[in-house]
Amino acid sequence: MAINLDGAYLTIRESLRHMPVQEWGRVLAVSSIAGVRGLKGAHAYSASKHGVIGMIRALCADHAKLPVTFNAICPGYVDTDIIDRNTQSISERAHISQEEARALMVDLNPHGRLITADEVASAALWICGPGSDSFDGQAMEISGGQP
């Protein structure tokens, strides 16, 4: 909770000190699909990521007069080193191999694959770009349609 929610809050709070003097700005927080849908067995993680989304929406309402947008990205399972740690944890708890645990994550994505870091980065670049002025107070899912 302290890293996911408090860390995001403290970082955003400091960045807001500089926003009013600029002509426009973007605040983008990283949440998770778990913050949108909840994740079985990960109550605190899901709650902290849901808190990030709530904070972003409240900041959007509070600072609507600033030329700043507030959004969150909510990736599903992204093919990174974190997946290896997750598959190890799942395999130990479920008494299955790490390959089977990874396959479970892949199966959650209707595209039949993990999300790539480049896909997340592309979404973040669009949200932070000059053509996204009306995209504000949103939690963008980057999950391949993961339920």
What are these regions (language model features)?
Residues 10-12, 16, 24, 111-142:
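C-terminal substrate-recognition "lid" of short-chain dehydrogenase/reductases
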Residues 32:
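Residue(s) in the substrate-gating loop at a strand-loop-helix junction
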Residues 70, 75-85, 89:
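Short, flexible catalytic-loop segment of classical short-chain dehydrogenase/reductase
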Residues 38-46, 58:
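Active-site loop-to-helix junction immediately N-terminal to the catalytic Tyr of the SDR YXXXK motif
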Residues 1-10, 24, 28, 52:
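Catalytic Tyr-X3-Lys loop
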Residues 64, 69, 135-137:
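Short, small/polar-rich loop/turn modules that mediate ligand/substrate recognition or access, typified
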